[in-house]
Amino acid sequence: MSKNRAEKAEIIEEIGEKLNEYPIIYLTNFEGLTVAQSNDLRGRFREAGVEYQVTKNTLARLALDRIEGKDALEEFFAGPTAIAFSEDPAKPARVLQDFLEEEELGRPELKVAWIEGDMYDDPEALDTLAELKSREELIGEVIGRLLAPAQNLVGGLQGPGQRLSGLLQSLADEEEDE
């Protein structure tokens, strides 16, 4: 096996592992970005905890062939394609949306977002996906809503006791003054 072939096999294996591991996959068309813009975008993804890589479409398709359930993505591996892998559905969308707003280029454009088995290839999908709350935010909201009745109960129980304590204190103060 030649070194070139071995390197390709390694890349296919790596992409396949990521496609299998991550529930969130974004494919973008990065055509028209300068090297500086591409590096800036990579840095933003890295800061957000999103893996982002450019790979040959042929190698990505070969990796897809080894994975069940994600073969519908194959048609989107045409033209310049970059892949963003994430655990959070909103992070890649927010990075892309912020980049698009700041750079005003119209690139990179979203080809498709694969969110735990559902595909979003509509151009407006990016706005919707960017508004999604992260898993941690949703868990925090649920916990907050579960704790709210208990906090209200504690406040309700403390209220009369505090009023009674205040009344007794004012009576004691009046007796001292007399």
Curated annotation (Swiss-Prot):
Molecular function GO terms recorded: large ribosomal subunit rRNA binding; structural constituent of ribosome
Keywords: Ribonucleoprotein, Ribosomal protein, RNA-binding, rRNA-binding
GO biological process terms on file: translation
Any one of the GO CC terms: large ribosomal subunit
Xref: Pfam families: Ribosomal_L10
Highest rank taxon of the organism: Bacteria
InterPro entries linked: Ribosomal_uL10 (IPR001790), Ribosomal_uL10-like_sf (IPR043141), Ribosomal_uL10_bac (IPR022973), Ribosomal_uL10_bac_type (IPR047865), Ribosomal_uL10_CS_bac (IPR002363)
SUPFAM superfamilies found in the cross-reference section: Ribosomal protein L10-like
Entry-linked HAMAP family: Ribosomal_uL10
Complexes and interactors: Part of the ribosomal stalk of the 50S ribosomal subunit. The N-terminus interacts with L11 and the large rRNA to form the base of the stalk. The C-terminus forms an elongated spine to which L12 dimers bind in a sequential fashion forming a multimeric L10(L12)X complex.
Biological role: Forms part of the ribosomal stalk, playing a central role in the interaction of the ribosome with GTP-bound translation factors.
Similarity comment: Belongs to the universal ribosomal protein uL10 family.
Listed name of the protein: Large ribosomal subunit protein uL10
Lineage, opening ranks: Bacteria, Pseudomonadati, Rhodothermota, Rhodothermia, Rhodothermales
